[in-house]
Regions:
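Short, positively charged and aromatic/hydrophobic N-terminal segments
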Residues: 4, 16-27, 34, 40, ...
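Contiguous, well-ordered alpha-helical segments that form the cores/surfaces of helical PPI scaffolds
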Residues: 354, 552-565, 585
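Buried hydrophobic packing segments
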Residues: 77, 81, 286, 290, ...
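Charged, amphipathic alpha-helical regulatory modules used
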Residues: 48-162, 166
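Conserved catalytic cores of very large enzyme subunits
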Residues: 148-149, 156-548, 569, 573-681
Length: 681
């Protein structure tokens, strides 16, 4: 059989292009609509005789469910109807010319772009108009079967690979979780289910697509299924003073330091089980209970011995007993935090804030507590082999102020001890009270976990409040990808940045809306019993999501790489610094603008990107190839940090990064790697 096109003629009365074929020496005219790109020839004598392609015709496009725009392919429509056709009796089947007519009717819409759903709706209507009800039913079943396949659970492989210990991406995503332990695996399995539902059901397709393409990173999808938040500053002072409730049991205010330490660790564990980020505790609130213990021992020895022994001896007894309780209480904190397992499959991610406030009536007791915490951290905790090692938690933050900055202050001895501790155990981290007061309206307070900072907020009485506040969640933007897409052209870079920021805003609002309407019953320890608030049972948490009470964070990755692409130099070079600062200021302006427009506490946040810096770089390397100093390294530099390959001394690095910390007030941390300093203190 042979078929040859030998002439074409346009009809004057119809917008149809007639194509004449020589089919086995018989001239066959076949009409085709002008708007077709790729047209299968009319069905003749039970066989198709070729394909017609008029390249001058306007291309027809189809918009898929995920927003992608693809070329129109009529074959897919024909195949779908034919599959339904094969499912019904012969008398219910639709003839091939009728199928062709349906397809032609769709193509005759003269639309440059059709939605997939619209095409399917038209097919169903056509089948019904032909009175092919059984066929229409089969097509509808076919349509929705395909939809179910698209929306089918996609977690089987990831869950089975977790159980088989072969899913390295998930197992290594969080270094604080031992993915081989059954209880941790249960959390990771739940996380895979949450990620699957988040992508298929909860998030708009454009956000999921942006996440998959590395345009942005929607953090903590594995917990997005539930109405829980990121990180917080526990209002531990209120909980210890006014009591709390755990597992339906009333916990009254402690009468001693040891009990206060035990209750605090129980609170930390309960809080960690109902949120996914870090938490911080200001140990200043423990000083009061150490004094209670002192008074208890003084009363005991006065009653027991009276004037039988001198006051000096009684004071020695009190001192010894108090020191024993102090050591035991701090040891309780350290061991409980490192041995308790929360429902999210790890030890509580908690930070102890070691701050001596000169106006604190319990400053002497708190100095004793800080000293014991540092001494026990220097000692370490024994591992299973009996060797002292550095515990991962609690993370320690030590505040440097006028009275302990090694300039003759009363508490300089604590700073020397902290330095000794850092040299051996890497912690504590340090905060400058002076710099914090400059950047946070005169206030000194802890970050939430590792680096997320609240913005100043005043209650109805005009008093600043930080404890009992939280962060709603994080979305991070991939800055180097914008520069790579713009090919280093600033005229393209800045408009594209605006588009990506708009996408990040939408993603962040998804986080915010997911928390709106949440009832306090979801986590009583947070919302009803003091960690965050003392709401009524069944009360919505919405008022805590607005007016800047809580924060929501825009993270960012790769200021160094972005600057390198756009300027050709590092952001430590004056030319690069100028661009990097403009970029950071634009990110900050976006957050400030969103905050004004919505009343929600948007903040700019230097993302903790231990795994994300690799993910973004890997995605971009596949798309843009290996680019020197950008994708060839296999990672992007975290936030505004100096590239680790750059030769720069520790003090110069801190000085350089300081200017970015002021802009990134919603979260910032700077660090250096140093050799063994234990013999250089």
């Amino acid at each position: 059989m042979s078929s040859t096109i030998f002439s074409e003629k346009k009809s004057e009365n119809h917008n149809i292009l007639w194509t004449f074929f020589a089919h086995n020496d018989i001239i066959v005219p076949v009409p085709f609509l002008k708007q077709r790109k790729l047209l299968r020839k009319r069905h003749l004598w039970g066989s198709f005789i070729g394909v017609y392609d008029n390249k001058e015709e306007k291309e027809m496009k189809v918009t898929k469910r995920d927003g992608r725009i693809v070329d129109y392919d009529r074959n897919k429509i024909v195949i779908a109807i034919q599959k339904a056709n094969a499912e019904v009796d012969r008398y219910e089947q639709l003839a091939d010319d009728k199928i062709e007519s349906i397809v032609a009717g769709i193509e005759n819409k003269h639309a440059d772009n059709l939605l997939v759903e619209d095409i399917q709706d038209m097919i169903e209507q056509k089948l019904m108009s032909e009175h092919k009800y059984e066929l229409a039913k089969k097509y509808i079943i076919y349509r929705y079967t395909r939809q179910m396949v698209r929306q089918a659970n996609t977690t089987d492989d990831s869950i089975m690979s977790l159980i088989q210990n072969s899913n390295k991406d998930v197992m290594e995503e969080n270094s604080n979780k031992n993915a081989y332990i059954a209880s941790t695996q249960r959390d990771l399995i739940a996380g895979e289910v949450s990620k699957d539902l988040t992508k298929r059901v909860l998030l708009p397709e454009k956000i999921v697509k942006a996440h998959e393409e590395g345009i942005l990173h929607f953090h903590d999808m594995d917990y997005f299924l539930q109405s829980i938040f990121n990180c917080c500053l526990i209002n531990i002072g209120d909980m210890l003073e006014n009591g709390t409730v755990m597992n339906g049991k009333l916990i009254e205010s402690p009468k001693s330091f040891q009990v206060a330490c035990t209750v605090m660790t129980q609170i930390i564990s309960a809080v960690a089980s109902s949120q996914y980020g870090g938490q911080s505790v200001d140990i200043r609130h423990l000083g009061k209970y150490l004094r209670k213990s002192r008074k208890k021992y003084e009363k005991h020895y006065n009653k027991k011995y009276g004037e039988k022994i001198s006051k000096e001896i009684r004071d020695e007894f009190v001192k010894d007993r108090l020191h024993d309780e102090l050591r035991s209480g701090v040891q309780t904190i350290q061991y409980q935090i490192n041995t308790l397992m929360t429902t999210n499959g790890q030890s509580p991610f908690v930070t102890l804030f070691l701050n001596l406030d000169k106006n604190d009536p319990y400053i002497e007791e708190n100095a004793m507590i800080i000293e014991e915490i540092l001494n026990q951290r220097i000692e370490g905790i024994k591992n299973e082999k009996g060797v002292y090692v550095t515990p991962a938690f609690p993370k320690l933050i030590y505040v440097l102020d006028e009275h302990n900055c090694l300039k003759g202050g009363k508490y300089d001895y604590l700073t020397r001890l902290a330095v000794k501790c850092s040299a051996k155990r890497m912690y504590p981290d340090y905060i400058s009270a002076k710099k914090m007061r400059e950047n946070y309206e005169g206030n000194v307070f802890s970050c939430m976990g590792c680096r997320s900072f609240l913005t100043p907020w005043k209650d109805e009485n005009g008093n600043y409040q930080f404890e009992g506040r939280f962060n709603q969640g994080v979305v991070s933007i991939n800055l180097p990808q914008i520069a790579l897409t713009a090919k280093g052209d600033e005229e393209k870079f800045w408009p594209l940045l605006e588009e990506r920021l708009s996408l990040c805003f939408d993603a962040l609002m998804c986080r915010h809306h997911a928390l709106e309407g949440t009832l306090s019953n979801v986590s009583p320890i947070h919302w009803q019993y003091g960690a965050i608030a003392r709401l009524k049972k069944g009360e919505k948490i919405d008022k805590l999501l607005h007016n800047g009470y809580s924060t929501i964070s825009l993270g960012y990755i790769g200021v160094y790489e972005t600057t390198k692409i756009m300027t050709g130099v590092s952001h430590t070079d004056p030319k690069g610094t100028n661009f990097a600062l403009r970029l950071m200021q634009r990110l900050r302006l976006a957050c400030d603008t969103w905050k004004l427009e919505t009343g929600i506490g948007f903040g700019l946040y230097g993302t903790p990107a231990e795994s994300l810096c690799y993910r973004f770089a890997e995605i971009d390397k596949k798309k843009f190839g290996e680019i020197k100093d950008v994708t060839d390294k296999g990672y992007y530099t975290n936030s505004y940090h100096v590239d680790v390959r750059e030769k720069i001394d520790a003090f110069s690095k801190f000085k350089f990064e300081e200017q970015f910390q002021k802009i990134s007030s919603g979260g910032a941390i700077s660090y250096v790697e140093i050799p063994n300093m234990r013999h250089n203190l």
